Amino acid sequence: MDNIEKLYGEWLSLQPLKEEDSIRLNQKFMLEFNYNSNHMEGNTLTYGQTELLLLFGKVIGEANMKDLEEMKAHNVGLKMMQVEAAEKIHPLTETFIRQLHHTLLREDYTVYRRLPDGTTTSYVIHAGCYKTRPNSVITVTGESFEYASPEETPALMNDLVQWYNKAEVAGEMSPIELAAVFHYRYIRIHPFEDGNGRIARLMVNYILSRHNYPMIVIKTKDKANYLRALSAADAAVGSIPALSLIHI
């Protein structure tokens, strides 16, 4: 935390930035955040393709249509988050989180899965709606971790949002701590059937931006460290290890 606050102090000492520097920095962040957050989840667009798509609306080389639409939608979600974060008098709501999710996914779609016995099953991913099926993940230690059940999710999300709003007003936690703990608690719930990682990273930047901290990019090359931090937080059943998610 001391190093983060030191870097934040250095950032403040550079303010205000020249207009051209601010524009260039915002554009760089927009490209880096969109590219890395999507690439971490399997999006196949290169950084160059992402740049051409988001800055000029052009596509070069072979590109998956779903990945193109996903990248454009994520950029819309980023802008939506920044607008909402600027409205500092408005508390966080579940409605906003669900709207952000709907923006990312755009519409409902069907997923097909091949089962071990060779048969195929399918289910619908609902944009903007909490999960209706259990979800889990294989952790870095090789164990299966079950997220909150569909039945528990609405109450847990209500608790999370209420906790955040109260903690923000109380002011006992720094924005860095708020963002890290919110991220961790959100990921433990995994409220949606898809898009949870992208929403979590958008919400981290929502909290940082809301408190006038620079937004962050978790790069694909740091994915292993990112997952280890979450695993360490799970093992500790607390919030402190999650602070290692934040790098300014």
Kindly label every feature range from the protein language model.
Residues 1-194, 198-247:
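FIC/Doc superfamily catalytic core
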